[in-house]
Amino acid sequence: MREPAFWYRPRSPESQILRPLGALYGAITARRMALQGFDAGIPVICVGNYHVGGAGKTPTVLALTKLLRELGETPVVLSRGYGGRLQGPVMVDGARHIAADVGDEPLMMARDVPVVVARDRLDGVALAKSQGATVILMDDGFQNPRLLKDASLIVIDSERGIGNGKVFPAGPLRAPLKAQLARTDALVLIGDGRAANDVAAELAKRNKPELRARLKPDAASVAQLFGKRVFAFAGIGDPERFFRTLRASGIDVARTRRFDDHHMFSPEEIAALAAEAQREQLTLVTTEKDLARLRGSEGVPNGIVPFAVQLEFDDPAKLRQLISDHLYKARERRFGRR
């Protein structure tokens, strides 16, 4: 779904018209969030958003995976598998699954970390534990009460913020902000923008930490594209952020094309992109998430370059201490010891 432009305007007639629906949706979601979740028996760390659309959850999950391994843990990512047909529970296998099976994000992450896809998160937990998981990393699911969460980290793009502050469909919020703030343990702000400073200030009043991070382009990806004119395309939550990252890396972006988030490319669309790039002597470049979807499509031309990024935290020691503390508290609550 492509986000309506009015979601990111302070005031709009569309938002006012939809506000009653947003109030109803928000009340239902807030009530669900207050329900007691099932205790997985091992620590559960949730990486979520306050709003619909992309904000950097996937690179945050991958960064936390790396940290947890450094701490001696065996993390397994639990995903609902948005866009995939399999109900699960299933352990994602890049050799036999495509994005249409398990979703693009799980398929992409499975290259680096064990990923379980399950519509029913309790079934997913059981499979993850059978594979030796000592920590569950929930990719999304902050508003879902099914599992008890030991820590919830909320990711926000600091350039975009949370829009007009209204609840879907009047705005991008998945639930009333107050209800979501109350269940947040830390805020991850990606980039140097100020659009989410008010949210950070509200959480600071609750003694909840703010963690600044930024997306760093992979050096090999930059080198592969250096000196070339590129045709960049993306079907993610915020394609413009991808295009900005390319330009900020010194890459000559001659043409761009945006698609809806999680867009499944048809053979005709792929052929049209390739023909346009060839006609103008451009190199096709896309995100790793988009490439995960393309790998399951017919007629994908050779030469599409995936542009890799990774999340780097400004204060890694602060993040390490935060996660260590939550793991300790989670185990102390269950077992009375570390």
UniProtKB/Swiss-Prot annotation:
Protein keywords: ATP-binding, Kinase, Lipid A biosynthesis, Lipid biosynthesis, Lipid metabolism, Nucleotide-binding, Transferase
Involved pathway(s): Glycolipid biosynthesis; lipid IV(A) biosynthesis; lipid IV(A) from (3R)-3-hydroxytetradecanoyl-[acyl-carrier-protein] and UDP-N-acetyl-alpha-D-glucosamine: step 6/6
Cellular component, GO annotation: plasma membrane
EC number from the UniProt entry: 2.7.1.130
GO MF annotation terms: ATP binding; tetraacyldisaccharide 4'-kinase activity
SUPFAM superfamilies attached to this UniProt entry: P-loop containing nucleoside triphosphate hydrolases (SSF52540)
Reactions it catalyzes: a lipid A disaccharide + ATP = a lipid IVA + ADP + H(+)
Any GO BP annotation: lipopolysaccharide core region biosynthetic process
Signal peptide: none
One Pfam family in the UniProt entry: LpxK
Uppermost EC category: transferase
Positions bound to ATP: 51-58
Functional note: Transfers the gamma-phosphate of ATP to the 4'-position of a tetraacyldisaccharide 1-phosphate intermediate (termed DS-1-P) to form tetraacyldisaccharide 1,4'-bis-phosphate (lipid IVA).
Similarity comment: family membership: Belongs to the LpxK family.
Matches recorded under HAMAP family: LpxK (MF_00409)
Protein name as annotated: Tetraacyldisaccharide 4'-kinase
Organism whose genome encodes this protein: Bradyrhizobium diazoefficiens (strain JCM 10833 / BCRC 13528 / IAM 13628 / NBRC 14792 / USDA 110)
